[in-house]
Amino acid sequence: MSDKTVKSTNLMAFVATKMLERQEDLDTCTEMQVEKMKTSTKARLKTESSFAPRTWEDAIKDKILRRSVDTSSLDKWQELKQELENVSDALKADSLWLPMKSLSLYSKVSNQEPSSIPIGEM
């Protein structure tokens, strides 16, 4: 074998060895990243699962919201909705009944006089 072939073979072996070492470093790094992600995900799940899912209605009931919210209109809403459902079909067929009824309901919920409600606000 010639000296040139031996040198090129040694050089190729050196490059291949370095590439394999680099690949092992990358694999180790990737494994470490995956383990870190798993650990942080488990920690996050422990933290998040300790809180029960809540709705804004629950927060209002528990008075946790920073601003006080007037819930009196929420109480009226069920009553007004029931009243609307109880109206006969004959009245619903009247073309003026629905706009007038919605204006009346809006004024009850918003505590405003019907004449003071801007048209675009309904």
UniProtKB/Swiss-Prot annotation:
The keyword Transport applies. It comes from Influenza C virus (strain C/JJ/1950). GO terms for cellular component: host cell nucleus; virion component. Mediates the nuclear export of encapsidated genomic RNAs (ribonucleoproteins, RNPs). Acts as an adapter between viral RNPs complexes and the nuclear export machinery of the cell. Possesses no intrinsic RNA-binding activity, but includes a C-terminal M1-binding domain. This domain is believed to allow recognition of RNPs to which the M1 protein is bound. The lineage of its organism: Viruses, Riboviria, Orthornavirae, Negarnaviricota, Polyploviricotina. It is found in: Virion; Host nucleus. Binds M1 protein. May interact with human nucleoporins and exportin XPO1/CRM1. Disulfide bonds: none annotated. It comes from the Viruses. Keywords: Host nucleus, Host-virus interaction, Transport, Virion. This is Nuclear export protein. Pfam families: Flu_C_NS2. Its main location: virion. A motif (Nuclear export signal) lies at residues 96-105.
